[in-house]
Regions:
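Bacterial N-terminal signal peptides that target proteins for export
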Residues: 2-10
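Generic detector of well-ordered alpha-helical segments enriched in charged/polar residues
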Residues: 7, 67, 79, 272-280
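Residues at structural and domain junctions
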Residues: 9, 60-61, 149, 173, ...
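C-terminal motif of bacterial Sec signal peptides marking the signal peptidase cleavage site
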Residues: 19-22
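Conserved functional acidic sites
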Residues: 36-37, 44-240
């Protein structure tokens, strides 16, 4: 082979090699995306997504209805057993329920305290509290002042979600610290909302179950003493029992005799109606009734002046067929009974909103009568 032929052959082979190499390179290299996008694949049904589910359960499914967490249950007594203090055991009973208020009495080993909750769409707060209250008045109607205005608490505030916090007039700070907490009580196991309230050196954990209300309280004082109160009994169709001392004429109509009786009042029952029945003999507690069956008590309440106010129907005078001595004893028996019920010394007794005035006794406008036990045998 001559030299030109050899060069021609080499040139053809070299060009073929370049073409083959170029073809192979084009087939092996993938195109490069200059701006890659990360693809997130949604979890398949059944895959574990615990964090997301817990977030949904604890926020989106929590009721925002205040009545779900602090319900108004008529004629229902709640009893709480406890450890760590003699005051850990107590009972609550709803005395009066209005559209936006709940008045209830809490009874423990030491005292009876009446509290009023006010409900709005966004919160439940205390608006009234009075310790040492052994009688029943509808304080929303009578307007009696709260004895501890600077100690009132906000119970719950929307939105109901973990992390929500608020400050109460008492100075305490409350926070929703957990939800769907499993809480065991003598009445059963509940899924509860946990609210932590702190004030000075005391921390309270309050647990509320939907539809039931407060089921448990755990109080930690100075990090040393733990006081626990747990719901131990729910009694429906119950009545509140309030003891009262009645004063009636003795058999000779010369003095007054004390008789112990008990009022049984349900939710929204005013005390005046049952007191009327006690005094007119309908209940059988009095041997000699003070009132006739025609007499009605128009109103009865304790005023901010610490005077018991009572107004009778006109039959109190019209049916008073007695001499001056017996009439005086009968009126004194009313004053002693009503004054004792409210634990006050003065009673303002009126008839149809006018001063009591009969042929034997005539009171002046605004004149009160004093509780007097000197004629009690």
């Amino acid at each position: 082979m001559n030299q030109p032929t050899i060069l021609k052959t080499v040139s053809v082979l070299t060009l073929s090699g370049f073409l083959l190499a170029a073809c192979n390179t084009a087939q092996e290299q993938e195109p490069v995306d200059p701006d890659p996008i990360e693809t997130v694949t949604a979890p398949e049904p059944g895959e574990d997504d615990t964090d997301t589910e817990e977030t949904i359960d604890e926020t989106d499914t929590l009721s925002q209805n205040m009545l779900d967490w602090l319900p108004m249950n008529e004629d229902t007594a709640y009893t709480y057993s406890g450890t760590g203090s003699e005051f850990a055991e107590y009972q609550t009973y709803p005395q009066f329920i209005h559209n936006d208020t709940l008045q209830f009495v809490e009874t423990n080993a030491s005292t009876e305290t009446v509290t009023i909750y006010e409900y709005t769409e966004n919160e439940v707060r205390e608006v009234f509290t009075r310790a040492e209250t052994y009688f029943r008045d509808d304080f929303v109607d009578t307007g009696l002042n709260s004895s501890e205005q600077d100690q009132l608490e906000i119970l719950l505030q929307a939105p109901v979600e973990i992390g929500r916090s608020w400050e109460s007039p008492s100075g305490s700070v409350s926070e929703i610290t957990d939800a769907n907490v499993e809480v065991e009580t003598p009445t059963g196991t509940y899924s509860a909302l946990e609210i932590t309230r702190t004030l000075n050196d005391q921390s309270d954990k309050l647990y509320y179950a939907k539809g039931t209300g407060l089921i448990q309280t755990i109080s930690d004082v100075d990090g040393e003493a733990e006081i626990v109160s747990s719901l131990s009994n729910i009694q429906e169709d119950a009545a509140e029992e309030i003891p009262i001392t009645l004063y009636e004429l003795n058999e000779m109509a010369t003095a007054l005799t004390p008789t112990n009786a008990t009022m049984e009042l349900r939710t929204n029952d005013p005390a005046r109606l049952q007191l009327t029945e006690l005094l007119n003999g309908s209940t059988g507690d009095m041997t000699i009734p003070t009132l006739t069956e025609n007499v009605e008590i128009n109103y009865l309440y304790l005023g901010n002046d610490q005077i018991a106010h009572v107004d009778f129907s006109e039959e109190l005078i019209n049916d008073m067929n007695a001499g001056s001595g017996i009439e005086a004893l009968l009126i004194q028996s009313l004053v002693n009974t009503i004054g004792g019920f409210y634990e006050v010394d003065e009673v303002l007794l009126t008839v149809e909103e006018a001063p009591y005035a009969s042929g034997h006794i005539a009171l002046e406008e605004g004149q009160t009568m004093s509780v007097d036990l000197s004629n009690v045998e």
